[in-house]
Structures are given as structure tokens and as C-alpha cells.
Amino acid sequence: MINSFDFVSFLVIKQLCSLNYVNVDCFGKDVLKIVVSQLKIKNLNMSLVVVGSMAFDAIETPFGKSDKIIGGAATYIAWCASNFTPVKQISVVGGDFPQAELDALTARGVVLEGVQIKKDEKTFFWSGKYHLDMNTRDTLDTQLNVLENFQPVVPESYQDCEILMLGNLVPSVQSSVIKQMRNRPKLIVMDTMNFWMEIMMDDLKHTISLVDVLLVNDSEARQLSGEYSLVKAAKKIMEMGPKYVIIKKGEHGALLFHENEVFFAPALPLEEVFDPTGAGDTFAGGFVAHLAKTKDISFENMKTAIILGSAMASFCVEKFGTQRLTEINAEDIKARVASFVQLVNFDIELV
């Protein structure tokens, strides 16, 4: 996990320099320790609650094939976000879900009080096969199992939630979590998919009206809005309720919309992509984790958040399932973010 002192130090420097009180070069490590202790910064992060599936996946791509492996939206989000901030998880698994996986998440600072374990039932299972472009796929098998009758319960210890991340689930299940919050979170982020648009559009639009940020891919944005232009699509979706819309374009990056403003974050070009299954969820995990860590949900900070989300997603696709996310450390993340900075950093002079 990223060292909390490093992050606190960074925020202190950023705040003081932004007020023109000091130049960043004035600070040595010893001075930073004094500044941090004097400011007595406590509870740096906003409380993050993640809702979503924890599952088994079996995946086939043109470059390899996996047996039954750990997957699920909430799993990817938690593995990613826990690099930066504590996570409180809401999900459901069967008695066949490995205790070792639950223990590993707990060791990362993921609170599992909201995860229901149905010992006599089976965990949600999905199997899919990706085409050569790695953007389209065919579902080979879906077994809802415990997810079929999932009724999430928000524990009392989760009621301090400030950022709520709703992973892809039945829209009515997502909205039920919002209703259980005594105080509305400061930011509600929602992911969804085309399947719900095809079979329960009214329920989906109702849930969308309750959230602040909607995450969709480009084809879903067009289907939801009825517009081909992604700019027009985002505007129409914002009219449904969300203040912000993020349109994910896979290997081509992501777009962030707010009112009349647009921000584009590229995807890092990779030599090899083994499994894109959890990339969108990992992106979401990086996005909300940065907002929680910095306690800043402004549009300007969301720009940084989607860069971090893109960086984390670039790790996810390098191996099957959550494996790569379990291996990376703070130095890996810093190096990957630096690669993103170099990717888009340029000087231009008109002549």
C-alpha cells in the first residue's frame, strides 16, 4: 500500500504552495514531519463503500485461457482501491468462495462486514470468450447462484459513507443501497451495462437519477441516450440526473463530462493484453480511491482521478483475473503514473 506519510506530506506541500506561502524546494523530509505533526492531520481519507459482485470467472482470449478464477466487480474495485484507501465492501458469496481470498482482502484493509456468505449456495459464475480485438466478447455461461436473490444490507459501521461506489448490479439492488444510507453520501458513483438497458430501462433510469457520476462505455452511452455523438450522449445522460458522466473507450482511453466541460484521459499503449475483463472495474476503483484519498470531489480532481484509474486498469489487463493487482506495489504505481504523464506531456509553439 502507498505510504500514508508520503501522501500526507504531498498534500501539505500542495496546499501550502497553492497558497503561495512557500516554494516546494523549501521542504526537507525532517521539516515535513514537523509540519505534518503540527497540523495533526487525522482521518485523511473520505469513507469509501463499494457495492458489487464477488465471483468466479472462466475466461478465454486469443492469447490464453484461464480455469475458474476469482473475479467480480467489487473484487477488482477493492483490490485496486485498497492501494490508496480503506474500503468497506458490500457483496455476497457462496460457501465455495475461498476463505484465503477473503483473508487477503482483509489484510489489505478491506472491511468485509457487509459481505454475506451463503454457506449452502454457490458463488456467481461467468464464463466468456474474447474476440481478437479484445473489445468484444461472447458470454458462454452465466450462473447467478447467490446473486439471484441478493438483498444487500448496509451495516451500521458503514453509515459514515462519504463516497459510495455502486458496481454493476441489478439497478433496483443498487438503489436499495442508496435508500439504506441515513445520510446521503457526498458522492455516489454508479457503473452499469447494456444488459439492464435492454430488459429494465425504466428501473435503470430511476437509479441513474439518484447518482452523481455514471460510468458507461461508448456503446452503452449511445444506447442509453439514443445519440451517436458521445458529446451529445453525455449531455442527454446528464439530463437524467448525474452531474458527471465518464465514458470508457477501452484501449482508446476515457472521457469525463461535466456541464459544458470535457476532459480526455488516454489509455497506456501496451505490448500485451491478456485479459480485459476487470479493466473497467479497476478503472472505477482507482477513480473513487483517489477522490477518497484526497478528500476532493471537484471536477479538477476528477481529472487526476481518471488518470489514476487508467493507470491501474493498465495493470489489470496484463494477467488473468485479479492476479496482477495482487502483485503491484507503490513503486510500480508511481512508475506507471509517470508513464502516463510522459504520454501526454508536450510543449507546442505556434510559428
Q: Where do the language-model regions lie?
A:
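Conserved phosphate-binding/catalytic region of the ribokinase-like
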Residues: 230-351
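Positively charged, low-complexity intrinsically disordered leader regions
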Residues: 44-60
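Conserved N-terminal subdomain of the carbohydrate kinase-like
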Residues: 56-68, 83-165, 179-185, 334-351
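Histidine-anchored nucleotide/phosphate-binding helix
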Residues: 73-82
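Conserved phosphate/ATP/ADP-binding segment of small-molecule kinases
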Residues: 182-187, 196-264
